[in-house]
């Protein structure tokens, strides 16, 4: 009898393990909006992918926005979306970016409007539900990617839009302009006088065609101070390691 119970328990554990693994794979798949490559500061390519697309790790550092704009104009690139990380509100990450970021997820507004100037924000459905933020409400972000209480009290964000649920990581994000993030982390009097000093966290890229899948990352990794990482390749490696 005991052996039968142990066998049933073993099968149950295996089944649950497979189920959890499958759910995790599905989540990673949904969170990547068919991006081909991520460019960011040198370090762990997996860390770069996890932090920039799945928002479950810390970034590898920052890169020059001036250099990022050059990469977006490369003949191999169809489009690029810059992102800047570093702050949160109640543990929900604040992402500085442009409006192409929302198009990656086919995002639609539930209520309100898109941001039009610095310190305006659009929030995901889960953020709205759990923080109780509403249109025209103000909030202040905290330094870092987890809530430490070290807040930017001098410059609050205003909620101007709430997104419809997407079933992706976007539901857990607060989206604003790059200018908003730069304003908070730089000397505002000098920020736009010296655009060469502006930085972002990463660049999310889509190729014009798949022939660039090997040549473009090699170009970035060998000839620049940045790294290029394939989201699909890094997540595939992760699941091979974890079984």
Give residue spans per PLM region.
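Hydrophobic alpha-helical transmembrane segments of multi-pass inner-membrane transport and secretion
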Residues: 1-24, 239-243
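Hydrophobic, regular-secondary-structure patches
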Residues: 14, 18-93, 103, 117, ...
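Short amphipathic alpha-helical segments
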Residues: 35, 119, 199-203
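Active-site/binding-pocket entry motifs
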Residues: 44-46, 100-101, 165, 234
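Conserved residues at the C-terminal ends of beta-strands
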Residues: 83, 142, 206
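Hydrophobic secondary-structure segments that place a key small or acidic residue at a functional site
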Residues: 88-99, 107-188
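Mechanotransmission and gating elements of multispan inner-membrane complexes involved in transport
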Residues: 153-156, 162-243
């Amino acid at each position: 009898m005991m052996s039968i119970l142990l066998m049933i328990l073993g099968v149950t554990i295996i089944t649950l393990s497979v189920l959890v693994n499958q759910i995790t794979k599905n989540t990673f798949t949904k969170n990547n909006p068919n991006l081909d490559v991520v460019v960011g500061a040198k370090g762990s390519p997996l860390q770069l992918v996890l932090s920039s697309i799945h928002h479950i790790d810390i970034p590898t550092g920052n890169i020059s926005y001036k250099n990022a704009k050059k990469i977006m104009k490369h003949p191999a690139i169809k489009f690029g979306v810059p992102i800047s990380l570093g702050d949160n509100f109640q543990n929900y990450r604040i992402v500085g970016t442009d409006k192409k970021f929302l198009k990656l997820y086919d995002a639609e507004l539930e209520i309100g409007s898109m941001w039009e100037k610095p310190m305006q924000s659009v929030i995901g459905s889960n953020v709205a539900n759990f923080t109780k933020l509403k249109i025209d409400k103000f909030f202040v972000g905290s330094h870092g990617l987890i809530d430490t209480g070290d807040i930017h009290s001098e410059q609050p964000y205003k909620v101007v839009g709430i997104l419809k649920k997407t079933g992706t990581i976007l539901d857990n994000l607060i989206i604003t302009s790059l200018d908003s993030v730069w304003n908070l982390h730089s000397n505002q009097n000098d920020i736009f006088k010296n655009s060469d000093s502006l930085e972002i966290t990463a660049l999310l890229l889509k190729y014009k065609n798949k022939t660039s899948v090997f040549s473009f990352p090699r170009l970035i990794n060998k000839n620049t101070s940045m790294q290029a990482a394939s989201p699909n390749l890094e997540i595939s490696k992760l699941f091979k390691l974890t079984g």
